[in-house]
């Protein structure tokens, strides 16, 4: 699993170690070429803090040049991100509910792909609007497991308290074909 934050304003992924940065708009293309350092399993893997200049690629601002296509392009990006990563949490750094969900996953030794919306500038609020369109939920955290929308903090904690979260995580791990 990958723990990361995305900074669309600077177009780089950041996290806790010193692996190279990966541009957000390159996710689907790079992953298909086998260059993205994601392991599709529930074991912790971390991609790192930006240590070189971002590669040249189309930016979210470029993708958002027309209002009619920006929503659909961001929607495609969200759908691809959710489909290609077993656990994704759209979060805000200052949100206590987001912190609770991230702590829960950490206690389960699951490191989700974390997208910190408040660190993305205007793209963060655009992504939050796209998430509302897709899920009907505007608040964070917005949790996806195995490509399915789980809900927010209370939904995730409720699944955990009922003993159902681990089974959902195991199923998501199985979908990704690795243990």
UniProtKB/Swiss-Prot annotation:
Residues 75-176 form the Glutaredoxin domain. The keyword Calcium does not apply. One of its GO terms (molecular function) is metal ion binding. It is found in: Plastid, Chloroplast. This is Monothiol glutaredoxin-S12, chloroplastic. Transmembrane segments: none annotated. GO terms for cellular component: chloroplast. [2Fe-2S] cluster binds at residue 95. It holds the Pfam family Glutaredoxin. It comes from the Eukaryota. It comes from Arabidopsis thaliana.
């Amino acid at each position: 699993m990958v723990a990361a934050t995305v900074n669309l304003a600077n177009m780089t992924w950041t996290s806790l170690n010193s692996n190279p940065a990966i541009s957000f708009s390159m996710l689907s293309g790079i992953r298909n070429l086998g260059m993205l350092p994601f392991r599709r399993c529930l074991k912790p893997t971390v991609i790192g803090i930006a240590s070189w200049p971002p590669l040249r690629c189309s930016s979210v601002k470029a993708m958002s040049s027309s209002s009619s296509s920006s929503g659909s392009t961001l929607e495609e990006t969200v759908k691809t991100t959710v489909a290609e990563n077993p656990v994704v949490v759209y979060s805000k750094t200052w949100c206590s509910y987001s912190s609770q969900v991230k702590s829960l996953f950490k206690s389960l030794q699951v490191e989700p792909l974390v997208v910190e919306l408040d660190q993305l500038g205007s793209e963060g609020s655009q992504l939050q609007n796209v998430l509302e369109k897709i899920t009907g939920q505007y608040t964070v955290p917005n949790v996806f497991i195995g490509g399915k929308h789980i809900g927010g903090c209370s939904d995730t904690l409720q699944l955990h308290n009922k003993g159902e979260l681990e089974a959902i995580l195991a199923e998501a791990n199985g979908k990704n074909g690795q243990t």
